[in-house]
Design a protein with these regions (language model features):
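OB-fold and OB-like single-stranded nucleic-acid-recognition modules
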Residues: 1-326
């Protein structure tokens, strides 16, 4: 099976860096040196994004330093963040590329509910030159493949229609033992990635014929900012009172998409998708019940075998693996 597209690129001002070099102990009890932590980037619209990074210092069973260790160590040496900049210093403009969205599920300490979100795992870091920093677009973009699970009208918190549509995409996390072979991947986990298609592209979006259950590639912009609204309240006498309301605006805005295809076109089957769904349900239940180690239970249904059945000659294009079962 080929590798599904899952690409995040972020360019922005470096707000702060929490990268550090440290020694950790593996599950096997072996101590290894690593660079780990997060950086925070601010885009032109004042959105801020956390990018998580990790690399071993040495190659396996070798004293040779890894490529990413050298790159991250150099980054830590050269970077200037908004948090640490002194007078006369200009904070670094950084591009994080080759990043991926990953599922992040945890149990709330306050409510006990399972919260499902996504995190950004980074790979390549580049500090833009002064000349490039003046010209580069500071933005966060995504290109992700997955199964469309739901398309519906978007509503605000007061249940009012916004005029946009919500598109729930289900990307599939994969794994491989051979990263040099783009066709040696197998499915591992399915998760939710909510997007929005805004009014100006609705007609074009609807004309493509997307349906719940089709496999697509979506490209767009990521927003994660704070919106402050001021409400002026008139009083019976004296000066009016101003109340400020702060709202976090987090959305993934679709800007383009591929021609829809079926799951069978990418070597998926109904049984394979159903197994991924059940594995997902079981994982969330185990987090809720604090059952064992999440990582150990991540493969509760065993290895998902590669599909062996042939795709139907005339597959039902209306097939939706996420629809409720009767």
């Amino acid at each position: 099976m080929r590798k599904f597209i899952n690409e995040i690129t972020i360019t922005g001002d470096l707000v702060k860096s929490e990268l550090e070099e440290k020694t950790i102990t593996t599950k096997e009890g072996k101590e290894i040196e690593v660079i780990t932590g997060s950086i925070y980037l601010r885009t032109a619209d004042k959105s801020e994004f956390e990018v998580r990074l990790y690399t071993n210092k040495f190659k396996k069973d070798s004293s040779e330093e890894t490529y990413f260790y050298k790159k991250y160590a150099k980054f830590m040496e050269d970077m200037i963040s908004i948090e640490t900049a002194v007078e006369g210093q200009v904070p670094s403009v950084v591009t994080a590329s080759g990043c991926e969205i990953r599922p992040n599920d945890y149990k709330s300490k306050n409510t006990g509910d399972v919260i499902s979100s996504t995190v950004i795992n980074g790979r390549f870091l580049e500090i833009e030159s002064q000349k490039a920093a003046e010209m580069v677009s500071k933005e966060a973009s995504f290109t992700i493949e997955g199964i469309i699970g739901k398309i519906e009208d978007e509503m605000d918190k007061n249940k009012n229609l916004t005029g946009n549509k919500t598109v729930v995409l289900y990307p599939i996390r994969q794994k491989t033992e051979d990263f040099t072979n783009e066709n040696a991947y197998e499915v591992d986990e399915i998760y939710e990635y909510e997007c929005v298609i805004e009014q100006d592209l609705l007609a074009a979006f609807d004309s493509v014929g997307y349906y719940e259950g089709c496999f697509v590639e979506l490209t767009g912009k990521m927003v994660n900012t704070v919106e402050v609204k001021t409400e002026v309240i008139e009083q019976a006498f004296g000066s009016p009172i101003e109340k400020k309301k702060t709202t976090i605006v987090k959305k993934n805005v679709i800007k383009s998409g591929s021609v829809p295809s079926t799951i069978y076109d990418v070597e998926l089957t109904d049984e394979l998708v159903e197994a991924l769904k059940q594995r997902r349900v079981k994982k969330l239940e185990e987090i809720k019940l604090d059952v064992g180690n999440k990582k150990q239970n991540n493969n509760a249904f065993g290895k998902v075998a590669a599909p062996t059945q042939q795709a139907p000659v005339n597959p039902n294009v209306g097939y939706n693996p996420f629809a409720p079962k009767n």
